[in-house]
UniProtKB/Swiss-Prot annotation:
Keywords: DNA-binding
GO molecular function: DNA binding
Top-level taxon of origin: Viruses
Start-end of DNA-binding region: 22-41
Disulfide bond positions: none
Protein name according to UniProt: ImmF control region 10 kDa protein
Pfam families from the UniProt entry: HTH_3
SUPFAM superfamilies registered for this protein in UniProt: lambda repressor-like DNA-binding domains (SSF47413)
SMART domains: HTH_XRE
The HTH cro/C1-type domain, residue ranges: 11-65
CDD domains: HTH_XRE
Species of origin: Bacillus phage phi105 (Bacteriophage phi-105)
């Protein structure tokens, strides 16, 4: 299961290494700064597509996610109450 807090912290650390402000990164990704903040703080999990775009922008090796025991769920949603990922029904 994807640990939103670990993933968010990893994204935030890599963003800071690149000396990017949240507003700059959010604009480059075509998302709001508040949504990026929610991702970095573990409140929301990005979709696989969004995570891939983030990884490209900040040079994040997606294999690092496996090493930190973070597993990505394809196009899943995030249940804030349960703090878990869930698959969307087709």
């Amino acid at each position: 299961m994807l640990d939103g807090k670990k993933l968010g912290a990893l994204i935030k650390d890599k963003r800071k290494e690149k000396h990017l402000k949240q507003t700059e990164m959010a604009k480059a990704l075509g998302m709001s700064r508040t949504y990026l903040s929610d991702i970095e703080n573990g409140r929301y999990l990005p979709s696989t597509k969004t995570l891939s775009r983030i990884a490209i922008l900040i040079n994040l090796d997606l294999n690092v996610l496996k090493m930190t025991e973070i597993q990505v769920v394809e196009e899943g949603g995030y249940d804030r109450a349960a703090g878990t990922c869930r698959r969307q029904a087709l």
